[in-house]
């Protein structure tokens, strides 16, 4: 789909020799070129370089829609497509149809250059890219893929991949790691596409729940625990840092994961990482004479970091 607005008649394309060279003849002479390339050549020779701008990007469903506007001289046209390149292609085509004096000339889009997902078999879509665009559109963290299982005989391997997106998780299986990853992404897209438009906002709230604890929200939180942390010294003996961090996490809406490191430190101590699901994610290291001590040290370091962040203005 494309729309155009013709402000003024464009000047004919001048050749370096005598006479004029119409845009229609340029297209006929170079049939292998796309509308974007032809329009760029036209703009270069007339000193009106095409300028493209993205007007709309809708990736809430598994087949995204983009709208691009192109301006060349006094002509402005828009085009829509399921990819940015396809939308630009259609905008350029609409501009060319106005610029050329001849009858409408249609362009065939080379399949390898600009495939239209709506006309492709399902197995040729790019669900991984579509899911990533969906996450970016909503401001979520990017999907994370983990190979969880690999088995089967050498001639018939099967891979299992887990895809995590905020608080959701889907599993995909395939004969290759890439196929398993694609299948997991497809399951996510199918889940989101089955949700009615009026529920998109509530879904965003559910998926984005773990994004609730940001540095901005920490600094401005009226919560009792976080404000107590701002006044605490964090150096008092017999303080249960793990419990204190757990209370703050519950109040501020983030989770804590303690990851024990198998290797001992250079001085022979146990090591641990405390991962906080804040936005951005916080990871703090700890060490001690036991696993418990290492976790407590990691919690202590995390509290010190949160205290610094919360006190900043």
From Swiss-Prot:
Pfam families cross-referenced by the UniProt entry: dsrm
InterPro entries found in the cross-reference section: dsRBD_dom, PRKRA_DSRM_1, PRKRA_DSRM_2, PRKRA_DSRM_3, RLC_Component
PTM annotation: Phosphorylated at Ser-246 in unstressed cells and at Ser-287 in stressed cells. Phosphorylation at Ser-246 appears to be a prerequisite for subsequent phosphorylation at Ser-287. Phosphorylation at Ser-246 and Ser-287 are necessary for activation of EIF2AK2/PKR under conditions of stress.
Keywords linked to the UniProt accession: Cytoplasm, Phosphoprotein, Repeat, RNA-binding, RNA-mediated gene silencing
DRBM domain mapped to chain residues: 34-101, 126-194, 240-308
Compartments where located: Cytoplasm, Perinuclear region; Cytoplasm
Record region (Disordered): 1-20
Residue numbers bearing the Phosphoserine modification: 18, 167, 246, 287
GO CC, alphabetical: cytoplasm; nucleus; perinuclear region of cytoplasm; RISC complex; RISC-loading complex
Single GO molecular function: protein homodimerization activity
Region (Sufficient for self-association and interaction with TARBP2): 1-103, 102-195, 195-313
Keyword Repeat: yes
GO biological process, alphabetically ordered: antiviral innate immune response; cellular response to oxidative stress; ear development; middle ear morphogenesis; miRNA processing; outer ear morphogenesis; positive regulation of cell population proliferation; positive regulation of intrinsic apoptotic signaling pathway
Chain's role: Activates EIF2AK2/PKR in the absence of double-stranded RNA (dsRNA), leading to phosphorylation of EIF2S1/EFI2-alpha and inhibition of translation and induction of apoptosis. Required for siRNA production by DICER1 and for subsequent siRNA-mediated post-transcriptional gene silencing. Does not seem to be required for processing of pre-miRNA to miRNA by DICER1. Promotes UBC9-p53/TP53 association, sumoylation and phosphorylation of p53/TP53 at 'Lys-386' at 'Ser-392' respectively and enhances its activity in a EIF2AK2/PKR-dependent manner.
PANTHER family (UniProt xref): INTERFERON-INDUCIBLE DOUBLE-STRANDED RNA-DEPENDENT PROTEIN KINASE ACTIVATOR A, LOQUACIOUS, ISOFORM B
Self-association state and partner proteins as the record states: Homodimer. Interacts with EIF2AK2/PKR through its DRBM domains. Interacts with DICER1, AGO2 and TARBP2. Also able to interact with dsRNA. Interacts with UBC9. Forms a complex with UBC9 and p53/TP53. Interacts with DUS2L (via DRBM domain).
Entry domain remark: Self-association may occur via interactions between DRBM domains as follows: DRBM 1/DRBM 1, DRBM 1/DRBM 2, DRBM 2/DRBM 2 or DRBM 3/DRBM3.
Annotated family: Belongs to the PRKRA family.
Protein's name in the database: Interferon-inducible double-stranded RNA-dependent protein kinase activator A
Organism per entry: Rattus norvegicus (Rat)
Gene name of the record: Prkra
